[in-house]
């Protein structure tokens, strides 16, 4: 508890900067509209909240229905808080309308939450007959944003009060003095009735906030665990989470790829939008894992190459007749492509480029014979990355942009390796690039942010990062 209060105290100093932000981790900016929608959805009782609110089997169930928190045997039902009122006056709660949610972010503290609802009641009137009443109620609460013992963002109810509004009489006769009696009873019981509702709603939202931090699988490569790097920040428009991605191997060991020294420059967030920023580090880490696992290496054989791609000694000799003119003709070629170093990703000027340094060993062989080495090349392949977001990850599709080669060693005469660049580009584009795209199907994982769907987000490549923006 002491640690939690210490965090709350520090929070008063933590408010986000409105200028161009520089960061090296994953960044999530949650617009206040999204937080408001999460609270509203918890009241409606969406299927995702069934474990918290109970089974949702009909329109009138859920949080407000007969089987929910407030209806039936709940707070509004038989035996609930209003049982006391019923014993005193025969007053019974008949209906509670879906509250209207009003939300205000409090920089350096948390949230001011208001729920405006209408309570429908009936009772036996003092003059006989049935009285039907309705009272407007505003529930106002101050909610602190803190960090739980698990290291997740958490909303904590600090203060709650109710304000009784207009009371309407729909049927029956009620003397004016009894209006005051009803008002006094409601004033006493409503805080005990509706403030626990706020606490329950916050519990639902806290589960969604807690999902921001968790383990995301990278398939055979390992996983990424997201954790808070710093205290969350609060402005009057959004909550900002600075998230540290921790990469782990399949065995669970932490893989510490060097982070870029150049921070990402993220533009200011527009109103009524939420953002996730994917840092350069995650791109370099993904390609680094692929390289260390050998997923970027390939043996290119004639069986893998389309018929329109030349891959024989005859084709090669035509390109370099002075160096390779004496080779036996019509023999098939083998290309052993090995990426010896981690690729380098560049995110700059609305483009995503990947540089792959590779050694290409070219051999020829007679069917059923032993392959014979011709030469080795040191190459740098520059591929362009097309990025597409989905709900859970950022998909990457590669296409070759350019290729440069130098001769590392030759078992024939010396030659200028640049004369093979066009031919190799044809081979790599036809065979190697599709293989890379299969390996990259794992994508770049996105943290879960209040169940916000980023599949239709606007994607922007900025300096050393990719920013996904979705309208609230």
Curated annotation (Swiss-Prot):
GO cellular component, one term: cytoplasm
Keywords: Cytoplasm, Disulfide bond, Glycoprotein, Secreted, Signal
Disulfide bonds: 160-195
Name of protein: BPI fold-containing family B member 3
Organism: Homo sapiens (Human)
Annotated signal peptide: 1-16
GO function term, MF aspect, one: lipid binding
Any one GO biological process: innate immune response
Residues bearing attached sugar chains per UniProt: 138, 284, 453
Expressed in which tissues: Detected in nasal septal epithelium.
Record has Cytoplasm as a keyword: yes
Family listed: Belongs to the BPI/LBP/Plunc superfamily. BPI/LBP family.
SUPFAM superfamilies tied to this protein: Bactericidal permeability-increasing protein, BPI
InterPro entries, sorted: Bactericidal_perm-incr_a/b_dom (IPR017943), BPI_fold-BPI/LBP (IPR051660), Lipid-bd_serum_glycop_C (IPR001124), Lipid-bd_serum_glycop_N (IPR017942)
Role description: May have the capacity to recognize and bind specific classes of odorants. May act as a carrier molecule, transporting odorants across the mucus layer to access receptor sites. May serve as a primary defense mechanism by recognizing and removing potentially harmful odorants or pathogenic microorganisms from the mucosa or clearing excess odorant from mucus to enable new odorant stimuli to be received.
Localization of this protein: Secreted; Cytoplasm
Keyword Membrane: no
């Amino acid at each position: 508890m002491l640690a939690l209060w210490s965090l709350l105290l520090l929070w008063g100093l933590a408010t986000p900067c409105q200028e161009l932000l520089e960061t090296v981790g994953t960044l999530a900016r949650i617009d206040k509209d999204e937080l408001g929608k999460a609270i509203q959805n918890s009241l409606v009782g969406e299927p995702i909240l069934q474990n918290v609110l109970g089974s949702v089997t009909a329109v009138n169930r859920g949080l407000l229905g007969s089987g929910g928190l407030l209806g039936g045997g709940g707070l509004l039902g038989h035996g609930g808080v209003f049982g006391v009122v019923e014993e005193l006056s025969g007053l019974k709660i008949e209906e509670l309308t879906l509250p209207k949610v009003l939300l205000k972010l409090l920089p350096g503290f948390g949230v001011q939450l208001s729920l405006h609802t209408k309570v429908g009641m009936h009772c036996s009137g003092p003059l006989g007959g049935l009285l039907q009443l309705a009272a407007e109620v505003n529930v106002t609460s101050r909610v602190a944003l803190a960090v739980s013992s698990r290291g997740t963002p958490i909303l904590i109810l600090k203060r709650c009060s109710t304000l009784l509004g207009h009371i309407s009489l729909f049927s029956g006769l009620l003397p004016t003095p009894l209006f005051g009696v009803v008002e006094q009873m409601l004033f006493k019981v409503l805080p005990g009735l509706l403030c626990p509702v706020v606490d329950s709603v916050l519990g639902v939202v806290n589960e969604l906030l807690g999902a921001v931090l968790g383990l995301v699988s990278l398939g055979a490569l390992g996983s990424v665990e997201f954790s808070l790097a710093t205290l969350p920040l609060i402005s009057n428009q959004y909550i900002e989470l600075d998230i540290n991605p921790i990469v782990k191997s399949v065995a669970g060991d932490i893989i510490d790829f060097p982070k870029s020294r150049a921070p990402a420059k993220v533009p200011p967030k527009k109103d009524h939008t939420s953002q996730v920023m994917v840092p350069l580090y995650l791109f370099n880490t993904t390609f680094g894992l692929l390289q260390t696992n050998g997923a970027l290496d390939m043996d290119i054989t004639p069986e893998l190459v389309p018929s329109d791609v030349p891959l024989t000694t005859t084709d090669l000799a035509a390109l370099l007749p002075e160096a390779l003119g004496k080779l036996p003709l019509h023999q098939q070629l083998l290309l052993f492509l090995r990426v010896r170093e981690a690729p380098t990703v560049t995110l700059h000027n609305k483009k995503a480029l990947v540089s792959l340094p590779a050694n290409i060993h070219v051999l020829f062989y007679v069917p059923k014979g032993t392959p014979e080495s011709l030469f080795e090349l040191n190459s740098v392949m520059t591929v362009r990355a097309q990025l597409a977001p989905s709900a859970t990850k950022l998909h990457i599709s590669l296409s070759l942009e350019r290729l440069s080669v130098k001769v590392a060693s030759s078992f024939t005469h010396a030659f200028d390796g640049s004369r093979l660049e066009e031919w190799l580009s044809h081979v790599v584009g036809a065979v190697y690039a599709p293989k890379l795209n299969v390996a990259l199907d794992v994508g770049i994982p996105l943290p879960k942010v209040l169940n916000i769907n980023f599949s239709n987000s606007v994607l922007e490549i900025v300096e050393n990062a990719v920013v996904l923006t979705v309208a609230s």
